[in-house]
Amino acid sequence: MQEYHIHNLDCPDCASKLERDLNELDYVKKAQINFSTSKLFLDTSDFEKVKAFIKQNEPHLSLSFKEATEKPLSFTPLIITIMVFLGAILILHLNPSPLIEKAMFFVLALVYLVSGKDVILGAFRGLRKGQFFDENALMLIATIAAFFVGAYEESVSIMVFYSAGEFLQKLAVSRSKKSLKALVDVAPNLAYLKKGDELVSVAPEDLRVNDIVVVKVGEKVPVDGVVVKGESLLDERALSGESMPVNVSENSKVLGGSLNLKAVLEIQVEKMYKDSSIAKVVDLVQQATNEKSETEKFITKFSRYYTPSVLFIALMIAVLPPLFSMGSFDEWIYRGLVALMVSCPCALVISVPLGYFGGVGAASRKGILMKGVHVLEVLTQAKSIAFDKTGTLTKGVFKVTDIVPQNGHSKEEVLHYASCSQLLSTHPIALSIQKACEEMLKDDKHQHDIKNYEEVSGMGVKAQCHTDLIIAGNEKMLDQFHIAHSPSKENGTIVHVAFNQTYVGYIVISDEIKDDAIECLRDLKVQGIENFCILSGDRKSATESIAQTLGCEYHASLLPEEKTSVFKTFKERYKAPAIFVGDGINDAPTLASADVGIGMGKGSELSKQSADIVITNDSLNSLVKVLAIAKKTKSIIWQNILFALGIKAVFIVLGLMGVASLWEAVFGDVGVTLLALANSMRAMRA
């Protein structure tokens, strides 16, 4: 579907009606409007006809491919209108002479027309299309009817305060939209393309693969690429949530959206902007807010019946009692108008999507990206969670946990020999040994003269350090060189070490459990998760050790299809939605089959594509945060629904009893909408 920006769309109910009208057109396959971001997603065979339809039915709206600069809303006209209105009322009551009454009548009529301009025009547009239940038409009918029953001061006051409420509603919506735009603004706006000795300013979208771009200090990398010249530090916080800068030099891969902190870089473009990391982050957030939750779908359908129902009730209040001699028509029409004032479903229609929008926005600022708002609803119902082990519950970073010397050698010697043999290796196991050697022995690797270095695939390394031959690897490596050695029973990866054909001992290397893993599971229990399980392709001993530490059940040595099958059984056992958290390629099928699949940001691209939620900062505590956000968002939305319906029901009853006035009924409509909007904004701070 093609994406368009809709300008001047400031009414949520109008957005729903326009979406419905567009979907009824023969030449439109699908139309979807995101009121929160003012975007139209359109699949049509005739775009010009769509434009003409919108121009005819909503002439104040316009479409464009690019977002227009938003004009700031001005309080001045509103304040002047209110001041003139209050001044006229004050003069009228202080000096109620016939001349003053006539003069103030014309002033109030002018105030009515000025403040109600949008309502009056909108009402006539709606009536022309046969939309008799349009909120503008109902407001116009209510104020005119109030005028004819002698309540012309209240008629004008309703229009003034309704318009004031609409203005404040626009302001609140505008601010919420800016919150999303603040997230989108992490994407770079410009790129400096190198053409010979010149730099040309272009949009990142216009860059092509193999182009060379120059990124100065303080600027953002426009697209994913590789450094061809220069060395610097990059801040990748916008992509991963990590605050630690990353050092890059020639041949280093860099991500679009990263901030250059230290020196000028020349980067060769590897991906088009639409395929870059930052574009995917922005797209994920926007796609999430485009989707409608089940609650929102229900409210949209409910609102279509709500307005006619309230209008019917108001009509019955106005007509039936006088027919049975229970009072005058003027009295009961006035009471019916009070009920009519609360017929607009705006508080419901706008607060639900903005509540979810706030939840998605709050999550994104914490490094949690959602692919749809439906996951917020499902998360609140989940009772079970299963984890992959390596890279999810563990750091995926190897660490020396034990050194076992043999044949009279010391731990220090075993570690020193192993480190010497692996100085030229970049394998994670080799790096963990080098790190341990630096920490324990303060060994200076630059003093070692390494010769004849050889990596034996799947087994280990062989290297000559000065005049000594060192071999480090698994049992197969030692067997190949006919070196006798002792068997090991420890859990983890074993690196055997031989020095000049003599076995000196072995090193145990284990993956570390994440620092926040235990705390995460404890906090998840507080959030209502009752059942925990580890599903791993690793061997039983390694998985069992982690499971015992965390206190949860486990299944080990699983193939990808077995992992999916075991997860399905785990989920069915507890008869409630279940979450799966993983990061590897073998996790993708299970992530896709889970009620909510959560992919860790440093995992494989396939796992992130299969997940409903991507945690960019790789922190397990983000699981706790996203559950808390989901629950708070749901709570806020249902507060809005119950509050709006409750207040409106109260005013219908008060109108029937003749207790409430039209002034007070304005609060039942506009006031409730504003309070619901303000409450929805709390989700942004979840």
From Swiss-Prot:
Alphabetized PROSITE patterns for the sequence: ATPASE_E1_E2, HMA_1, HMA_2
Gene: cadA
Membrane topology annotation: Multi-pass membrane protein
GO molecular function list: ATP binding; ATP hydrolysis activity; cadmium ion transmembrane transporter activity; metal ion binding; P-type cadmium transporter activity; P-type zinc transporter activity
Domain HMA: 1-62
Protein name from the UniProt record: Cadmium, zinc and cobalt-transporting ATPase
Keyword Iron belongs to the record: no
Residues exposed to the Extracellular side: 93-102, 152-154, 328-332, 658-665
Variant or mutagenesis effect after changing residue 526 to A: In strain: 69A
Residue positions of the active site: 388 (4-aspartylphosphate intermediate)
